[in-house]
Amino acid sequence: IHITCADVQWDIAAGESFDIDSNDERLATGRIVLSTDDGSITINSIKRSQGNPSYKGNIELALYDEGIAVINEIDIEDYLKKVVPSEMPVSFGVNALKCQAVCARSYAYTQLTNNYYSEYGAHIDDSVSFQVYNNTYDSAEADEAVIATAGMVAVYNGELVKTYYYSTSCGYTADVCAWGSDEDNYPQYASVRAGTSDYNADIKSEKTFEQFITAKDSSDYDSEADMYRWKTVIGISELTAHFNSLIGSYLRKNGSVYILENGEPSDKDCKH
């Protein structure tokens, strides 16, 4: 492993450890960069489902008020080899993994211009906030899928698509209305049936959606998934507190809120 700190560089042999904490004076001089010729770097202070994860590429260590930031600079194709098996069971098969690889690659490329972690010199993190990365063992099947689709991305009218994806659908994909945007402005995100049935219900109708969501259609791809249909119980005091914490800012922004009674708009208008 090659270690660079300021203008000083030294090497440690494979299998040896390099220990550092937030009180280490070397961090005050700038970032510490760890690299290898063609190997991986294991970080013993990080735990993932496979144990201590190993990383290709460079590891940068930088001191911030919250502690030491660990930044992994890595080639996108190598990155994808650790995203694909972390986001999809490899038991789904190589063709499904190829689809996942294209989605993950498209999403990754769209993130190269974001500024979410610019203060750390990074684009994304390794969690579900972006894409889960390096959270399971390496997989030959996932590697094969990434290699077979190398460079392939999703495009719409010549533009790269930010390919949002999820673990389980209710039988339909979501469109941009989920984020309050106009679906007509984003036709690439049209809601479609996620199954083999040709029937398409008007799930924008409150009544039709209730009928749909309370039933189960075995033709839906995710019909056997645990989260295909689910329910939860929220106490009235908890729900009231949550509602009250949000209603003030909503009214200041929107001016009024319409109260629904039995799923239909009422003539009551609550203004702030």
For every predicted segment, state its role.
Residues I1-H272:
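Conserved, single-site charged/polar hotspot
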